[in-house]
C-alpha cells in the first residue's frame, strides 16, 4: 500500500527531524510467492507503479521539515535507472566496488548510492570463509542475486562452490585497515554511503557485532 508507506515515512521523518531514509525493494519471487503467498509481478513495472502512487499519495498531518528521501534496492541496470528516474537513489546489496562504479554511471552524480558491504573482522582465513559462507547460503539460491553476480563476471561454479575469489570479492575480511581499504574502494567508485553488515564469526546474527561497528565507525 503506497499510501500507507507515504504516511508512515512522512511521520517518521517528522519525528526524527529528517534522519529517516526510506528503502523500498521488490524482493524475490521464491520469497514473495513461496513464503508470502502473493503473486510476484514484473519487478520494474511494479516498482515504477508503486513509486508513482507513493509520490502522489496525500499526507495531511504535521509535515516534516523536508520530504524523506527514498532509495530503491537495485542491482541490475534497469532497476538502477528506475531508481534514478523515480527515487532519490539506490541501495545495492551483496555487490562489489566494480558494481558501485557501474551503478554510479547509471544513477548520475547527484543521486544517493548507499551500498552494502559485508565484513568479517578477523585475519584468520578459515574463520572468515566459514562466516562468509554461512551468510551467503540463504542468498545463493535467489535468482536476482545470482544474475547480479553473473553480470559481474562470476561463474555458476563460483557461486555454487563459494570459491575463494567469489568470497574475497564480496566480503571484506581481515584487519581493520584491510576492511577500511574495501570501504574506500566503494567510495572512490562513487558510493555516497557504505552500509556495513558485520558477519558474526559463529553465524549468530541475533547478537550485534558491536566490536566491528565500533572499530569501523567514522
Regions found by a protein language model. Give the residues of each.
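Active-site-adjacent structural elements that line small-molecule/cofactor binding pockets in enzymes
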Residues: 1-218
